[in-house]
Amino acid sequence: MKALVTKLVSSNAGVAALVLRVPVGLTLAAHGAQKLFAWFGGYGLEGTGQYMASLGLEPGFLMALLAGSAEFFGGLALALGLLTRPAAAVSAFTMLIAIFSAHIQNGLFLSNGGYEYALVLFAVTVSLAITGAGRLAVDNVIARALTTT
């Protein structure tokens, strides 16, 4: 189990992952806060749940809770570099669902409600799931602690 966790948190990605992970993590967290808490002009769980139900994602409230939690908590974890690979994988899955359930029928461009923004977030989170946190991450502290015990 220790070897699995060490492999999960280890990364040689350097500074590039940090440059991706912090702004994308904070952006995801802000979007999650819109869904969960109605912050930043969002609709909260009730409004987001109704929207998700209208897309056929039922039960809407639960889907809003799952998507909002993945974005908010996953985004914070990405920004900190805490369990980066699992947080990025969950975020990538969330973006894939968003692309195919809410945006694909609107085409590529965001100005028409398209999927370009979710696609960029998907690409970045897949990249982070592969590379790991990089430098200046809580994952590195965990990896060092596991290798010294």
Q: Language model features by range: what are they?
A:
Residues M1-W39, F61-S69, F73-T149:
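Extended, low-polarity transmembrane helix blocks
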Residues A38-P59:
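Membrane-interface interhelical connector segments
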